[in-house]
């Protein structure tokens, strides 16, 4: 899908349609495919983009959270100055599976006192019940199966 311009545009525009008119100050995308979909969404919405990276990949002071994976745990980080308190945040990633990565990202946003508007995903694997880990936040997806 990424190598085909029409498919990629369709995915980004489809997510934008699902996100609708929600007021957003910043888009947060998780390493690495969250960057691919989050950055163009931020651009189209006229807001900033904040990357969430794995441990040790960001150059400045960070907030961090350890989160559970199917096979262990890992650490996510975000710059401490990534957003102002009260910023309206849209979290974007390609896939919602078990929900561990996005739950960790939600915790990072909370540490910086951001307000999560929604979590947007290209694909949701409903059988893995990742949505259950998201604390009732609004979730939008293009494809669910």
Which functions belong to the PLM regions below?
Residues 1-145:
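PRPP-associated nucleotide enzymes
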């Amino acid at each position: 899908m990424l190598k085909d311009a029409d498919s990629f545009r369709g995915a980004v525009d489809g997510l934008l349609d699902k996100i609708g008119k929600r007021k957003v100050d910043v888009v947060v995308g998780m390493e690495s495919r969250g960057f691919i979909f989050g950055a163009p969404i931020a651009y189209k919405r006229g807001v900033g983009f904040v990357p969430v990276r794995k441990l040790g990949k960001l150059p400045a002071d960070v907030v961090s959270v350890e989160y559970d994976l199917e096979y262990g745990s890992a650490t996510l980080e975000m710059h401490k100055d990534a957003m102002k308190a009260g910023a309206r945040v849209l979290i974007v990633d390609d896939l919602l599976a078990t929900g561990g990565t996005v739950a960790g990202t939600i915790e990072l946003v909370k540490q910086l006192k951001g307000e999560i508007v929604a979590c947007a995903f290209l694909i949701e694997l409903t059988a893995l019940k990742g949505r259950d880990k998201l604390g009732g936040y609004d979730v939008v997806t293009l494809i669910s199966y």
